[in-house]
Amino acid sequence: MVEAAPRSAGNRTRESLAPRETVPVGAMAPLAAVRDSVVRAHQATIAAASAVARATLRDGLNPAPRQLGEKTWPETVDTFSTTRAAELAAVRCFRPLARSAKRELSSEDIDVLTRGGIEQVFGPTHRQTATDHATGRTIAANSMLTVASHGQVESIEGLESSPRGADFGGLTVRYNGDPVAAARSAAEVFGVFVGLHLCMSDCVAESQAHGTAPNPPSSQRLSLRVVEIDLVPIPHLRARVSIDGLEPSRDNGFDVTVDFIPRNGVPLGPGTNGHLQDWTGRVATTGRQALLSEFHMAHLARGDQGIAFGPEFSRYTGNRATRLPTGGLLLVDRVTEFSGTRGNWDAGADYRTEYDVPADAWYLEDTANGSVPHFVYMETSLQAALLMGYYLGPTLGSTETLRLRNLGGTATVSRRLDLRGKTVDQSSTLVSTTLMPGSSLQSFDYSLRVDGDEFYSGTTMFGYFSDSALDNQTGLDAGRHRPNWLETLESAPQIRTIDVAARRDRREPLCCTGALALVDHVDVVDGGGQYGKGYLHMTRDIEADEWFFDCHFYLDPVIPGSLGVESVIQCIQEWMVDVGMHRQWRDPQFHIPENVPFNWKYRGQFVPDDGHCELEVHVKDIRTQADSVVVVADASLWKPGLRIYELIDISVELREGI
């Protein structure tokens, strides 16, 4: 979870950028000096626009029963008002809590579901356990949860989930009797298919129909498409039902909703002082019970922080407080181990978390990389690191609401792995906590593993800041203007422009598209820059309706710094393609190089009203081998008048497809 950088769409204005001091970010300065520079580095011009507030909490956790009645049919599916259609997948996405290979259900399968046999039908990914605190024994969770008992459903086919956009998946039903009852049963089946019940150890599925019930049709077949699904305030979905395969309309079709509601007395989150119990019922990939689940991550991002972290955090709900990103930028799922104690900030607190990388993730479709893009490595590791550091409660002693900003770090990819469809095991250790008036600092070590193999590790520092501490943003250069390299030249060099937007095509494997189309053009000075090996420059507008403001963060919109890094990477990638480095391979792919430590430093943030941002890249080294070419560079990013990001040894590899 970082802050600030750019996206692209449409025409962008151009300007220039500037050099930087080559000070390794990984070497953390004394905390007092860091604090002094950081507190001056931010600006309190964050508009508290709630573009993401479509997920407003409904009243209470037990919604009033819904009645079948008149329905207003919208022309389009409700979504975030600021989101462009091409970027909807990144903002309004839902990742199933469990995935099953089941695509068809027989009448026997449905009968098993009516008797609570969810794992029996959908497999071990849907397994839940809990602890009987009276005996200490492991018992089955949600053993009383039954679904699909409302209507006579003969069979279900075409069962599939989609992670994004206006359609989250659906199914087709053959039934006898009442189509409304059959649709309610089918919607409940979809809910357990994607694992909504896994958020709680003991819940009930409450389904209701909305709209005009159709006359009993001659057909005994209906289709159901899920148009809304979420974990906040409680796991729920809304589906549109059409009879006999016809599209929903005012004359044919209706809506069905399902809420998964905790039974009376079932705790939803940690207790006072962050006491963690074996009540979630969620099973981690390791087979152990998860301490916190996807449900708690969603509430920490944009719901009730008291549910997420315990009653002490309730005062942050609805405020511009520290949060995880939401939507497609939420890249941590579960907490599986935790050795710390709330209120104790001594170094050494360890914790482990998990993130499931969907094989069909939006960023895999939009990236130019052969596997996940660089920002995913950064976001999933940094979100995991800060998560339990915040849980320890460093902000609870302040009378002000504090917001989180990443300040810098260093990280290295040690092994090239394809992460698609894998569960990333994230290990984090709190190195230090320093509490100061109006702010506090925490530093962490972290590493990522898949199937026991470490592939990424690093260190990072976060700061928690009050509004007053964010009032003065002085950037990396103590408030002075730092000119870009072009501005330091006595005479204008020869500049050529790479028109990235003109070649952008989803059929082009070496081009970022959709929400990751962060670059429209790159200005190039061949043989230029600080190292005489090439200079890249880009300026782009920042628009208030950029998709990432919907995701990062709720009530506190700033551009993720990881997307600033991603923008620099895309400039380098476009330059590598432009000069023909890819032509020697039949199936060239971009990757993150192994064993090239990358350092970053953030001393500011990009906010919706900044207007534009600027970046420059100094090509530092070109390493050519028989099977690959690696470009290493340094870069800086500016907001108007201030240089706020510095990247040292950012690198891109181009090689034959693996």
Q: Which residues make up each language-model segment?
A:
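Non-catalytic linker/capping segments at the edges of enzyme domains
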Residues: 2-13, 23-29, 33, 40, ...
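Long amphipathic alpha-helical coiled-coil
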Residues: 28, 32-46, 50-57, 61, ...
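Extended low-complexity, intrinsically disordered segments associated with secretion/export
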Residues: 52-79
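Structured N-terminal alpha/beta-domain signature
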Residues: 134-137, 143-226, 230-249
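Active-site helix/loop of acyl-thioester processing domains in fatty-acid/polyketide metabolism
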Residues: 160, 175-208, 335, 358-360, ...
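Short, structured beta-strand/loop micro-motifs enriched in basic residues and often containing a Trp
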Residues: 202-207, 405-411, 594-600
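Short nucleic-acid-contacting surface segments enriched for D/E, G, S/T with interspersed K/R
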Residues: 215-221, 417-425, 606-614
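Short tryptophan-centered beta-strand motifs in secreted/extracellular beta-sheet-rich domains
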Residues: 222-228, 424-430, 613-619
